[in-house]
A protein has these predicted regions:
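Acidic/His-leaning functional-site neighborhoods
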Residues: 101, 105-186
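HotDog/MaoC-like acyl-thioester-processing domains
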Residues: 13-14, 19-96, 150-155, 161-187
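Short structured motifs
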Residues: 8-14, 26, 141-146
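Hot-dog-fold acyl-thioester-processing enzymes
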Residues: 1-9, 52-58, 63-140
Length: 187
């Protein structure tokens, strides 16, 4: 059908990191569709139901051939069973950049950064941004806003700003346009 869901943004909160070997249960459910967007929650719980982490994600419905967002129709959404919207503090989808970010050393996108569509994998952007966290920084909340797709050989020019309890990283192209913006917060 020439359609795909592309992750636009997400907000992940980790209240407790499980110990190695802890049995966990992962849940996910879409909870709303609007225009060309779909919204989905995730949880990680212990087997007795204690919530360890939870997330919200926003997905854009695209035409694969053009990369342009396409309005959802009942044919696109009827097969989904909507779940309850998770009770959590929902952060805005867009991440505001501070004015005084510091440019960091640029690097080239390598093969190991790519997904099956030959673009940088969403999690790889998070790993790239983690390089700018102080060593003792324990992430409580991570937010990511995806703006453009980087491909093999593209140059990524990071900018970062550390504030009290927060680090913001913008992973830009050589013209200063962001591929992804990531915000990490401590508890």
């Amino acid at each position: 059908r020439d359609r795909a869901w592309v992750l636009s943004s997400w907000q992940v909160i980790v209240d407790e990191y499980p110990a190695m070997g802890t049995e966990i249960r992962i849940t996910t459910a879409p909870y709303d569709f609007k225009g060309f967007m779909g919204m989905r929650n995730f949880t990680i719980e212990t087997m007795d139901g204690k919530k360890l982490a939870w997330a919200n994600s926003n997905w854009t419905h695209l035409a694969i051939s053009t990369g342009v967002p396409v309005r959802l129709t009942p044919a696109d959404t009827d097969n989904y069973i909507l779940g309850e919207k998770l009770e959590m503090d929902y952060a805005p989808r867009k991440i505001k950049l501070p004015d005084d970010m510091t440019s960091q050393e640029s690097f080239t996108v390598q093969k190991h950064h790519l997904d099956t569509n030959h673009h940088v994998n969403n999690c790889q952007y998070i790993c790239m941004a983690e390089d700018f966290l102080p060593e003792d920084f324990k992430v409580y909340q991570m937010r990511a806003e995806y703006k453009m797709q980087a491909k093999l050989g593209d140059i990524i020019c990071p900018k970062a700003k550390a504030e009290t309890g927060k680090v913001i990283v913008s992973l830009d192209d050589t013209d200063g346009k962001a591929y992804a913006i990531i915000e990490f917060q401590q508890k």
